Amino acid sequence: MRKKEILKKGISFALVAAMGASLCACGGGKSSDSSEPKHFYSVEYPKNLPAAFSNDLGNVKIFGDNVIYQSYNEDYTVCSVYQYNIVEQTEKMLWEGTSEQLEDGTTIKNSSVSYFAVDDDNSIYLYVYQSNVTEECLNRDYSATTYDDVIERIMEMWGETEDAAIQEWNNWISGEYTAEDGTVDYAKFMKDYGLEWESTERLLKVDENGNTVYEKVVRETNPNEEGQWTINCNGIYCDGNGNLYVMMNKWSNDGTSDEYYVDVYDSDGNSTGKIELDGYVSNLIRMPNGNVAIGDFSGDHYVLREIDVNTMTVSEEGIEGFDGSLESGAAAYGEDELLIRENGSLSICNMKTHEREKLLNFMDYNIPASSVNSFGILSDGRIAVFSGSYSNTQMKYVYDLAILTEIDESEMPKTERINVACMWLDSNVESMAIEFNKKHEGYHISITEYNDPDAETYDDMLRSFTTAVAADKSIDMVIFNDYSQVVNFASKGLMTDLYQFLDNDTELTRDDLMPNVLTACEMDGKLVCLPTSFSIQTVVGKASDVGTTPGWTFDEMKALLDSKPQGTQLFYGMTRSQALQLCLNLGYKSYIDSATATCHFDTPEFVAALEFANMFPEEFEGQEDEDSSVLMNEGKVLLSEFYLNDFAEIQMYEAVFNDKLTYIGYPTTEGNGAMISLNNIYGITKNCKHPDIAWEFLRQFYLPTDNENDEYSYGFSVRKDGFEKFCENAQKPLEDGGWTWGWGNFEVEIHPATDEEIAAIKDLVYNATAVNGAVTNEIMNIINEEAAYYFSGEQSAEAVADKIQSRMQIYLSETK
């Protein structure tokens, strides 16, 4: 058995390294940081990378010419520290971890490195955590362990009641200790969970060859201590004068106080002082002058404040304006400058003038910005960038080491850019763009994030994005976060009709894609966008309450509520504004014709929508101990909004409602009342210089795939065969004996989907037509302003509908 939140995967690790050198156009698209890099580079990927790069790497850092990293052995029992010299292309082990197991596999001794730092003479400092099972515990006989002992131990470990401990054992733990014949190994559980540990934390300094220079015990603990405090190390750092800084956090176990400080040691391991800090510090940064500064957030920005090691104090004045990217580290770049990571790029920041200069955008050199975890300057002036991320397609971590050499602009090959704008870059999209770039010589997908750091709300950010991107004629493609953005752009004629490409594609046809998703992406008969996946939003209720056929009207919903005792709620937590927006999304195309810039709000249908919204409170005030799942089970809440992207939700809701479900949908005059939610919505702009190349990039998201791991992506496939395969896989036996899912007081054991469940979901999905998020914020604001007069009782619903009709028509005419 396993929990929903835990997905067990056998993870292996590998490094995909392209061989040889390549040149990529540099210049970067416009963004919130609109500066264009004035530096140009060639990029190469070393051939002879160490075998350890194929394992699980941890805590990778570039210091000078070396990559220092931790890597596990083949059976993942020992983690050691290695050094790879980039210039010489040599590898060596600096420190070997230890681990000892009993015959049954129980670990009784382990050592690992929490943090490391490198000095100017290439000495390496390690913060080592050594833990051992106590001698008394090793000699303890567990053979007589009983079920009651196990439950008591669970209660002790997690402070649970007896009933909760029994539930924990039955649902999450027992399967691991139960043999096929039903025999339960209680003794093995007690060995695993009843062990008492003693630990030692120590500082270890080794030279560049791995020889120990000194070893110093920092603290020791044992299970018999009645300690009032817990102490953790948060990182170690070196300055340019041989001093070592150890960040510590000490907090009381009763939660009443915290203490943050930095212990300082000289090059021989002698303690030289302690620096008290005001609060949590994100990390330490070595400055170009060799001093160390603390990095922390002050308000909205990251601030650097230098440490004075002579007085053991921190400067009150700091360098401001960083965006938090210094948590990825920094490297000295000349006498006064730091190399820092900002918004998908590398920049240099002058510590005296505070001026910045962008050196490069990662995407310009096919380096995945979202996966960069270390960078540095080599002794010959080249820039090294190490990246690593989990690949959903390869089901393992993939690592890369890129070496960038500065060249003259005249040496750059001529490359046509396809500029893609988005609010936030998805790592999977980034990976696909990089793969596309490597295969298409002469063209380069360049993705720029447009997110306004000064925006106070999501709506503000949407407006900022829409304004900036709509005005930028250099943008070829847009990745929309919100369907209302698509409506806004398409209504202004800014999007290209994708049907002209789809209908001429030799491998992809309209019949390959979900027909209702295509319809949802149409405006005036033109395919203005395509999502990479979709989900369904609808309403569920007990079949005994709402019947068995999806779809109903406002009057039928009101009648259901009227038939129930006073105080019964239709939905838990829904407000008037939310209810009204749902109605508008459902009937958007009947209310607004974007192609002709006309609207139809002075209708009985919209009046009914206003009356429906008025059934809900202006603000929802729930009780502190209220559980919506219990209220639904007891019939005090009749309906629930249902977000469908897999089949487990069905079984959970059936358990909560304790009845057969009907996907009744939101009240509407047509359709099944379900809405399609589009994810990662792509469009090609009218200004696109190379629309055929843009389509070549876009189409790869919709080609057939044999990848069994597609099910790990959010939502349903836009391809019909992908959706059908998803349904087919949902009926297969579950791995690991299945899993359970809990909601409030309810817990259900998830089983393979039944034929009945599959049929119901297919009917729901294929017949959903409305699109969630169709209403723009500007339109919603006009409606809310006028609807308030009806909700307050000042005007009738009909009068408000007429006023909305008048204002909306003016707005549509002005913004056409």
Predicted regions mapped to residue ranges:
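Glycine-centered hinge/linker elements that transmit conformational signals in sensory
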Residues: A595-D627, Q651-Y653, L661-Y666
